[in-house]
Amino acid sequence: MTQHLIHILPPQLANQIAAGEVVERPASVVKELVENSLDAGANHIQIDIEKGGAQLIRLRDNGCGIAKQDLTLALTRHATSKIATLADLEMILSLGFRGEALASISSVSRLTLTSRTANQTEAWQAYTQGREMNVEIQPASHPVGTTIEVANLFFNTPARRKFLRTDKTEFNHIDEVVRRIALAKPTISFTLTHNGKIIRQYRKVADQSVAQQQKRVAAICGNHFLQQATHIEWQHGDLHLYGWVSSPQLARPQNDLSYSYVNGRVMRDKIINHAVRQAYAELIPTGDQPAFILFLDLNPTELDVNVHPAKHEVRFHQARLIHGFILQGVQNALQAQLALTPTDNQTDSVAETKACYTADNNRAAAGSNIFSSTPYPRYSGATNRPTKTAQQCYAELINTDKNDNANVAPIIYAEPLTTQATPAITETADPYPHHSQVLALVENKALLLKEQEHFYVVPLKKLAQLQLTLSLAEKKSQPLLIPLSLSLDQAQAERWQQYQAQLLDSGFEIKQKHWQGQTRLSIIAVPQCLRQQNLQQLLLQLFNQHTDDLADFFAKNSELMTTYSLPEGTRLIANIEQQAKTQLADLKLAVDFSAYLT
């Protein structure tokens, strides 16, 4: 009889092979154990390390615990409480699900598992080591929760133990694992010790609000990161991106401040990292790494988490959509951040409190493909806002000394006029004798008009504001390609209630919901004339102050075109005269040219 060349591996050997994928180093053990504690509902986790984890890794939690009858199963390969069917795997939200971590860890160490559930009057302890798959169960003393001790890691695989680094290096890897997990779980306290000394202690925060989350971010990434970062809140359908993106000034050679998460799971995903790097491409030097903390939440059916042994990567079913969504969200946050950067000359901007609001901007989303990547200038502290109000400039321009007959004429740039027999400025035949005739641009800040025998200067900025006010009155609405999400604090929410009716009447379509104690707005559509504006900045300015006239507020705070060619200025005047000739008259500043025309 021919002997079989293919045979089934013994369970002990199979576990050790699996351990080669799951247990790379002590930090891998810590990651698996912490994730199990989180899945068990723990809100306090203590991790004790000795000699970099090679001698001892002890984790204690106050989770739901493991019942006596399940202790042996917990150490058996492919035994789990997380899933039961293939459909469960496709909808998985827990951090663990394969049921092989404890079996793999126990196959290369001496493992003790002590646990108690709330329904048990006493705790029970399970012990196993190495290739011996026998599990010893005995009574123990323990509060509700679980303690796992992993001693003498790789004691039975000398080749693996030989590749461990120094205690300091291995502990640094453990420290980084705890940091990454703690960032995603601010409502859970973590204590990390090494050789009996407390190294890290992250206290839990009260809730998941942005203000509370910032406490955990500051504890892990430092206050300097928070000072240089902008909170991002970006949502479209089932996709939700939130977190913090730093200013380009915080870019660094190493990626030690780059954190990304998918459905609460620590990730080092290529698609996410590429999208973020592309968003920063024009803002930071080549080779530098941006600093960011980003959380991506989406329907679990839209990704496959079972593609990496350590679950560091996922496979998105619509990778291009995810990439474009993240790219645009980060780009808009950066654009809003640069727009809000104060300058020494900026004196007329509205002060805003540094609070828990979003930093996304839908100017691109309003009318462009979300996969398009529109380049924008490298970071600069300068803005396009004038240092003086337009009215001051125009007043200085036309002001002449009453005691002097103005020996110097105003500087005027105009299209050449037809030469006449007399030196006086004459007008061409105007079919609308009571309409204004545009003669020239005045220093790119105003239009010189002639109406009958009178001359006027009209500020371009005021004209643009009037045009926006008239457009708002038309109440034409345009849907946004990707809705804009805003998170409001209590004061901002009260202002939103105050302005809600006026905003909806002017063409906004806004949905409101309450989430984790915060008011969240989803901007679905906006007035057509505001579609190119920084909506995030505009609305938050509105919710941070009081105004009686929304149209006037938007006109004064929108970024409007103030540089026109002469034909463009002519069309602007013609449009406004047809709609609001009386309001236009209020903007005209009379200019007396009689001294030059006689």
Swiss-Prot record:
It holds the Pfam family HATPase_c_3. Keywords: DNA damage, DNA repair. One of its GO terms (cellular component) is mismatch repair complex. It comes from the Bacteria. Belongs to the DNA mismatch repair MutL/HexB family. This protein is involved in the repair of mismatches in DNA. It is required for dam-dependent methyl-directed DNA mismatch repair. May act as a 'molecular matchmaker', a protein that promotes the formation of a stable complex between two or more DNA-binding proteins in an ATP-dependent manner without itself being part of a final effector complex. This is DNA mismatch repair protein MutL.
